[in-house]
Amino acid sequence: MPRPLRSLTVIAIAFSLLLAACLDEAALRELESALATEEAAILQTEAAGVAEEPATSTPRPPAPTRTPAPAGAGGSTTRPNQTWTVMLYQNADDEVLEQDIFIDLNEAERVGSTDRVRLVSQIDRYRGGFRGDGDWDSTRRYFIRQDDDLYRLGSEPAAEGESNMADGETLVDFVRWAVENYPADKYALILSDHGMGWPGGWNDPTARGQGRDDVPIARAFGDLLYLMELDRALAQAVRETGIGQFELIGFDACLMAHVEVFAAVQPYARYAVASQEVEPGLGWAYAAFLNELVNNPGMDGAALGRAIVDTYIVADERVVDDEARADYTGRRLSAEAVAQATAASATLSAVDLERLPAVLQALDEFALRLGEADPSLVARARRYAQSFESIFGEAAPPSYIDLAHFAALAAQQTGDAAVTDAAKALLAAMGDAILAETSGPERPGAYGMSIYFPNSDLFRASLSGYASYTSVAQRFADNSLWDDFLVAHYTGRPLTRTVTLPTPAPEAAGVAPGAGTITLDPIELSAGIATADQPVILTTQATGENIGFIYLFVGYYDEARNALKFADQDFIEGDATQAVDGVFYPVWDGPEIPIEFEWTPTLYAIDDGTRQVQALLNPEGYGATAEDATFSTDGRYVFASGEKRYARVIFDGRGDLRAVFGFTGADGTGAPSEITPQAGDRFILLDTWYDLATEAYYTTEGETLTFGATPWTWFAIDAPPGRYNLGFIVEDLDGNYSEAYVDVEVR
């Protein structure tokens, strides 16, 4: 289950917990007790039916550095007999998302429009995917009327055609139509599709080329509704309709809770709701939060944002409705079990955009203090901060990190008083701005806002680097020192309060504070032959600085191919393990690290319920113990339609499947989304090889697994006889690798 919805008071205490975790163990225990007491009191109050504090109340200060909120800053203006128009911009023109978004619209129909709350939608469907409701694949507009059927729309289309939902002009036209036909006192705009964080999202099969803007990232991802285009579209929509601003803008999409995204929409909305992580296929609980709005149309956007967060997953129709839940899971499971599994890594937060400028101001001060600190320690905080799924592939470390968790780690790692004070001020400002947030136990360091902090390779690459970042996240870059900090961090140039464009471009040259010069001694073996009864012991020593993670590698020699097949990889546990707010990372003692590992000839296989196939499980997330780690295997997901998509299956350390992610790119890049497997869907494993003659890496399609009624699991198997290559891989804090290998025969 996700963490309970947090009131402003609980969020304030939680941010204080982060700082305590950085500074003092006794204070940490004291604040943990206070947090538990506060949450218990809130739950008891809610159970007794006592109303929540009004949105205009001032929360208890989380730290003495907090600036008191001005009177009336807690909510927007409301009026008697207030009316709403809620606009759903639903781009379902995608194999993965079509059914989920279509059902979201049907969830809204279960509530339907009233005289004070009008619900409208523009939905674009996919050709050849979900076949429900007549399998139409056009773009339609609806005035949403009440209807209980989750699989067929009862509302009549108000317009039909085909539109490029990745075009900002399409969004402007929809908003214009909604305002002209359904004027109201307050407007909410909710956008659904693939999200990508600061680049934006919202792709469409009808889109061609690179779009309206010549930005480097478009050369890789094509025509999307990039963030600067969304900024322009919202400005045009607000200007042409004269609505002043939206009361709330929501992103029912993955990865959009970036401070860069909130900065882009801040001029056009009072409140925003978004997720830091990949959203589950369920999306938002439309029937639940719209029902709250219909029952209380006098609420403001803060209350609506809290309702969206509060109902997320736990009140979704496909969780609480028995028939819909069975259809969604393919099994007879309880609502509690489905909610718990679905919410494990889910996140959602509601933000008061009026308080965002204070966050940006505090972020500037924090960036300045980071610029004066030891950059290698800052890099360590970046690498170990709570991270989220990457759109740039697995070749680079995660670059989307939780801003609050990173600030706490930076204070801890640097031990710098100025950094700590700036982190306190930043967390206090964020505590004021974040109205509500929820996150599952697998994302314990998620606090509601992410930020982009790439490694040196991503920063210097054209598609992910300075040119794309400052062009796409333009409003944020124009009003923040963060991009200037990144330039200083990766070039060694001084950082000042003046926002300037670097000359020459930072891609041309620079430094990598997280990089380390790491060497590995030749591996010594206890024996050259390994059996199930006689394991081998591998020993070596790693020497160097900025060591992040160490991995075990196992490869199998295929004589017919004259190639080495990647068979297994795993984390080597650190000399110690530390945690900040439940996010664990290894600690290595000194620049000289002895490594010893006993290898019993073991590989791993995936069981789909009908067959078992040996598979490479890649280490994904470090945990307190091996059972708490997560692993992944990549392949091609094959839908019933025959369409293939690059995908990643995530397992926990206990052997259970946790999620399946699909990517819009062909190699694990692009927008991720959670796939809800249907019986008969297939997954083709991708095998990774190293050609011994050409010294080149390549992949081939391997065995096929099928989704059915039995949940997938992984389990250990005996390694078959043959020649193996064993080794250790040491990763520095910038994502570079040092390696040492040795051959072993398995009998």
How does the language model describe each region?
Residues D93-V96, D193-P199, G250, C254-H258:
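Gly/Ser/Thr-rich loops at beta-strand to alpha-helix junctions
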Residues R66-A184:
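N-terminal extension/subdomain marker
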Residues E32, E39, F102-L105, E109, ...:
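Extracytoplasmic/secreted envelope proteins and their assembly/folding machinery
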Residues G72, S76-R79, D204-A207, G211-R747:
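Terminal, contiguous helix-loop blocks that mediate binding/assembly
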Residues I13, L17, C22-T77, T503:
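Ser/Thr-rich, Proline-interspersed low-complexity disordered segments
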Residues Q99-I101, R131-G134, P199-D204, V261-F262, ...:
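Short, solvent-exposed loop/turn and secondary-structure capping segments
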Residues T85-Y89, R118-I123, Y187-L191, E247-F251, ...:
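Structural recognition of the beta-strand scaffold that forms the well-ordered cores
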Residues M1-T9:
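Bacterial N-terminal signal peptides that target proteins for export
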